Regions:
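Solvent-exposed, flexible loop/coil segments flanking beta-strands in beta-rich domains
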Residues: 1-35, 116-120, 128, 145-151
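Surface-exposed beta-strand/loop patches in noncatalytic accessory domains
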Residues: 3-11, 35-77, 116, 120
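Hydrophobic beta-strand segments within beta-rich accessory/binding domains
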Residues: 19-38, 81, 90-95, 102-103
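Short beta-strand/loop motifs in extracellular/secreted proteins, especially
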Residues: 28-30, 40-44, 110-112
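Short acidic, gly/pro-rich beta-turn/loop elements at beta-sheet edges
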Residues: 42, 56, 102-104, 124-126, ...
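Beta-sandwich interaction modules
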Residues: 61-90, 97-101
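Non-catalytic propeptide/linker segments at domain boundaries
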Residues: 85, 93-155
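A metal-dependent hydrolase metal-coordination microenvironment
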Residues: 147-196
């Protein structure tokens, strides 16, 4: 399977653009490679939906030009929900941050595309083994009732950070390690337009 979907960043292009592609049966991975130059990546937020309309990947295009959804967290790009790749019509939804388009493009149109294949490969920015949400995007890996520390005192932490899910420089695992090394009591990644 191989499909190419075309999109455009411009002052006249729709802020929300969609494209669909057909996934065959017995597909194990979906690999989506985009052609947009890195300098324009942060202008675009992408969501990939399966045939049931469930979001299976959400990410701001800001780092590696390859997105992948697989059956495990090791073959799924950060921002993706690993699991079974169902047969049927899938959708890529591209949303542009319109308030920055004209200023950064000088008014010219910037075409870009996604090449979608069922030939997966290793993933540089993978989700990992700690999967927080299931295929229906229901959070199952976070216990809201668990108390990590009690007592009145000053707590040291950060409520506003970004990772490579949006426009940050770190993967979540690296950012978490840094927080531990700094002795933070809490660390909260607050991505642009992304829930994770």
């Amino acid at each position: 399977m191989m499909t190419v979907l075309e999109f455009e960043i411009s002052g006249t292009a729709a802020c929300r653009q969609t494209g669909t592609f057909q996934v065959p049966s017995a597909c194990k991975q979906l690999r989506m490679t985009y052609t947009l130059d890195k300098q324009y990546g942060f202008l675009v937020f992408v969501a990939v939906k399966d045939p049931k309309g469930q979001i299976r990947l959400q990410k701001q295009l800001s780092s590696t030009p390859v997105l992948q959804i697989g059956e495990t967290g090791r073959d799924t790009t950060l921002g993706g929900i690993p699991g079974r790749i169902c047969e049927g019509k899938w959708q890529i939804e591209v949303c542009l941050f319109a308030e920055h388009v004209h200023r950064l493009t000088g008014g010219k149109g910037i075409p870009f595309s996604f090449e979608i294949t069922d030939q997966g490969d290793t993933v540089e920015e993978y989700v990992g083994d700690n999967i927080w949400a299931d295929e229906q995007f229901v959070y199952s890996g976070f216990d809201q009732k668990k108390v990590y520390r009690e007592g009145a005192r000053w707590y040291k932490g950060d409520f506003h950070t970004h990772t490579r899910l949006s426009d940050g420089k770190e993967l979540p695992t690296g950012a978490s390690r840094k927080a531990e090394l700094m002795g933070l009591d809490y660390y909260m990644a607050t991505e642009h337009n992304v829930v994770h």
